[in-house]
A protein has these predicted regions:
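Active-site-adjacent structural elements in enzyme catalytic domains
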Residues: 69-71
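Surface-exposed, charge/polar-rich loops and edge strands
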Residues: 2-46, 50-57, 61-62, 76-206
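Short hydrophobic beta-strand that contains or immediately precedes a catalytic carboxylate
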Residues: 64-67
Length: 206
């Protein structure tokens, strides 16, 4: 006989959460903030009760976030103090170097900067407030909402799309006219060059 274990849910101060990536899309954060702000206190509580933040326990029992960085940043900026986390793995017995190596090999971190360049683990911010804006990550989020690709379970799939767009659409063009850049992104997403990306939903034959 096997016993199914329920995930352990713990309230944690948002300011204490540790990122496992360097960037977020600040447009995505703004959308999360709007969503939170538009709800009543009761609805916000219900939302937070169904959107637990997954974490890995690291050295000193610190909570390292493996998903929902945009939500965590939005909560921080909206002044919401605590969020429920679900611990997916306890690696608190490891030293710092071993811990980050495990995160990296398990696909639980994304140490790439706003230019798509891989950085040393020390470049990962220690707080959600220090996450850097990557406009191409915002484009990837909007692209998925517009049907450019399907939601996928591949870790950090939106960052793969962000890097695809980064190599093809000029950053100044994105800053100058986001909507126009999105039209180009939507067209690119259906092409064969994007066929290797998770959630690709372009034509499979000519």
């Amino acid at each position: 006989m096997t016993t199914q274990r329920e995930p352990l849910l713990n309230p944690v101060a948002v300011s204490d959460l540790r990122p496992t990536q360097i960037t977020v899309g600040m447009r995505e954060v703004a959308l999360k903030r709007q969503m939170i702000r538009s709800q009543t206190a009761r609805k916000t509580g219900t939302f937070l009760g169904t959107h637990m933040v997954p974490v890995v326990l690291g050295p000193k029992k610190r909570n390292y976030v493996t998903d929902h960085h945009h939500l965590a940043r939005a909560l921080l900026e909206e002044g919401i103090r605590d969020v429920l986390v679900t611990v997916i793995s306890d690696l608190s017995g490891l030293d710092k170097d071993a811990f980050f190596n495990v995160l990296d090999n398990r696909g639980w971190m994304h140490p790439f900067d706003e230019n798509g360049k891989r950085r040393d683990y020390d470049a990962i911010p220690k707080t959600m407030a220090e996450l850097v804006d990557d406009p191409y990550r915002s484009m990837a989020g909007e692209l998925r909402r517009q049907g450019g690709f399907a939601k996928d379970t591949t870790p950090f799939s939106e960052f793969l799309w962000a890097d695809f767009l980064r190599r093809r659409i000029d950053r100044d063009a994105v800053a100058k006219n986001f909507d126009k850049a999105m039209k180009e992104a939507l067209s690119l997403s259906k092409g064969k060059d994007a066929g290797y990306l998770p959630g690709w939903c372009g034509p499979t034959s000519d």
